């Protein structure tokens, strides 16, 4: 029952992004970028070219823009902001397997393609795990971390939950065939109501891959090397979170030397549902993690 409840909350959260979204404004245009040896993915690149760079890494079942569009206009005032659709999400790379390691390497490959040397990696939920892995696998490229509503491991670390995720994926394969897949051109149409735009973004990720996502999340565990993280790190704790419970988020605060804690009075979808309360502490968190690069 706990497993089913966790899944139900996750689906409600994903649909909540769509049905009660934060009003969209100044959504940046994007383009497909082909990463040599890896594949094509959808990318947005906005803000001052000479400003410190922040990569925004999204949560599961969303896209780079669906997860992060509320914060981009404010960030663009003093940061160059990059979003990307991760593997099998939206217009992300299609690969035989889904791996957070691969997602982390995609971030650095994209930075190479864009001519970006060093950057702050900010991630929400799944994106927080990817951000940690970007530092772990490419420490020389990361100037700071911003970890939001995430932890050092995910619930599918538990084999029972991972098995449930696979069963759910099989069920959703049939459901996914009945759902309309938005035409690519319509994903970029921001003239429609935010709910319509958000629904198109949501439907661009195949629900049939839920099992693969669960497997990819389940193998992630940073607890053994958290103490090695040596860049400015901000942790944004969602205090009403029922997906990544606050106690698990606090492990990042306690485990990373010098980590600064920020708080948002919201649940696991706070980046969009209640974004007006998420944006201020998130911007503060980015500023704190980027202090070194800004001063330099």
Tell me what each language-model feature is.
Residues 36-93:
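Conserved HGGG/HGGXW glycine-rich cap/lid loop of the alpha/beta-hydrolase fold
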Residues 259-296:
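Catalytic active-site module of serine/aspartate enzymes centered on a nucleophile-bearing elbow/loop
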Residues 240-244, 269:
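Acidic catalytic loop of the alpha/beta-hydrolase fold
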Residues 132, 136, 143-173:
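Flexible "cap/lid" loop of the alpha/beta hydrolase fold
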């Amino acid at each position: 029952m706990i497993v089913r409840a966790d899944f139900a909350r996750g689906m409600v959260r994903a649909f909540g992004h769509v049905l009660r979204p934060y009003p969209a404004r100044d959504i940046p245009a994007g383009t497909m970028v082909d990463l040599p040896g890896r594949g094509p993915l959808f990318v947005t690149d906005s803000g001052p070219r000479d400003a410190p760079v922040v990569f925004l890494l999204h949560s599961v079942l969303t896209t780079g823009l669906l997860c992060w569009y509320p914060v981009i206009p404010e960030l663009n005032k003093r940061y160059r902001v990059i979003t990307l659709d991760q593997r099998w999400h939206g217009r992300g790379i299609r690969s035989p397997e889904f791996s957070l390691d691969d997602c982390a390497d995609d971030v650095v490959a994209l930075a190479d393609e864009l001519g970006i040397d060093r950057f702050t990696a900010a991630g929400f939920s799944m994106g927080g795990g990817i951000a940690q892995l970007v530092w772990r696998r490419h420490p020389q490229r990361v100037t700071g971390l911003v970890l939001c509503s995430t932890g050092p491991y995910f619930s599918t670390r538990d084999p029972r939950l991972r098995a449930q995720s696979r069963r759910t994926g099989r069920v959703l394969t049939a459901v996914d065939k009945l759902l309309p897949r938005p035409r690519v051109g319509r994903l970029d149409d921001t003239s429609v109501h935010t709910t319509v735009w958000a629904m198109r973004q949501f439907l661009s990720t195949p629900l049939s891959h839920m099992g693969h996502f669960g497997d990819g999340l389940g193998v992630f565990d940073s607890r053994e090397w958290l103490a090695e993280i040596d860049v400015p790190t901000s942790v944004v704790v969602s205090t009403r979170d029922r997906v990544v419970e606050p106690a698990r988020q606090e492990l990042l605060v306690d485990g990373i030397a010098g980590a600064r804690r920020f708080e948002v009075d919201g649940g696991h979808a706070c980046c969009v549902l209640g974004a007006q309360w998420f944006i201020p502490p998130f911007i503060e968190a980015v500023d704190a993690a980027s202090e070194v690069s800004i001063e330099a």
